[in-house]
Amino acid sequence: LLRARIKSIQSRLERVRNQREQSRRARRRAELPVLSLVGYTNAGKSTLFNRITTSEVYAADKLFATLDPTLARVDIEHLGPVLFADTVGFISDLPTTLVESFKATLEETADASLLLHVVDVSANNRDELMADVEAVLGEIQADGLPQLVVFNKLDLLEQTPRILRNESGTPTAVYLSAVTGEGVDLLF
């Protein structure tokens, strides 16, 4: 009975992978850049996705509020059309029974043009959470993709939105609040 159930689940996962691969091929043919929101669970990815895309995907302060990647096309001044992808929140020490289904969901991320690594700036353990996300990105071969860190929930710290740049002037991080919208314009 258990073997049959496992086989059924593996078969469904394979169908999902195939469907997503077909979708990825279609997006590549359309040549639209994909900006993928990644980050630890409850970092505010869906709230930021909704703010940028004017969508209304479910956003809640709980585990697995987002279970499937959501895509939305947005026309950005100076860039043109892009696809934004909202992804499932990462968690550490994921039970082995869930690893395969999460990998199937997160494989979309490996095809992104840019990762927007959303971090809850108010979290006391944010460095640890960022490291957990980086580890998962490595597991799905997405750790070599261009990345911009988005420190979200700035409204909880009463700080000013800003951009951090490296020595050559390239943006490396943006501080903003997806809830209030402050600093979101700095992304573009």
Residue ranges and their predicted role:
Residues 1-114:
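Conserved G1/Walker A P-loop phosphate-binding module
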Residues 86, 176-177:
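Glycine-rich beta-strand-to-loop/alpha-helix junction loops that act as flexible
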Residues 40, 121-122, 179:
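Structured loop/turn residues at secondary-structure junctions
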Residues 5, 9, 44-45, 156-160, ...:
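Conserved GTPase G-domain signal focused on the G5
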Residues 76-81, 94, 102-175:
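Conserved C-terminal guanine-recognition region of P-loop GTPase G domains, centered on the G4
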